[in-house]
Amino acid sequence: QVIEPWLCTRATPFTDALCREAIPRGIAALKTLMEKECADSRDELAWVSLCGGLALANAGLGVVHGLAGPLGGLSDASHGALCGCLLPFGLELNESQVTNPALRQRFLDVRQWIAAGLGVSPDDAWQSLREWSQRSGLGNLRDLGVPREALEPAALAASSSSSMKANPVTLESEQLLEMLEAAWE
């Protein structure tokens, strides 16, 4: 919930200040917690969560949350698992549609933060995030119990959801469906 506000159309200096530090700290803390229990990392994630709540309330969200809402209503999958599963796919889809140089830089920032946290090249950030998530036990949409027949209604519902209003690029329901199908496989 700190990555989407960084990329949203309604990002402000206030939300940027919250997200700029929270994103890399959140990645590092989550990576540690997936390997071992660590009270300091739990404290970090609590701080990141606070920053995320403040940032999303002020900047909005995007495609990941736009799709997670309808999918949660059409399945028993948890909101957090849906967002975690969808994040690398949403980053990839959004970035592929960006033409604005300033927004391209924001995506590069996220690539660099993820790459640093996972110890990979920024060019490999989205794929590495997807692979790390799966190695850490977060499966694809199918593994989360999302029925394939829920994908199209979710894409249609998301295309007009309030969470999509601040997405950095306009996405059609067909693009959302393609993204969901990739995340389901």
Go through each PLM region and give its residues.
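Gly/Pro-rich interdomain helix-loop hinge
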Residues: L74-A150
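Predominant activation on well-ordered alpha-helical scaffold segments within soluble catalytic domains
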Residues: Q1-E4, R20-K31, A46, L50, ...
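Alpha-helix C-capping/helix-to-loop hinge sites
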Residues: P5-R10, L33, G52, L74, ...
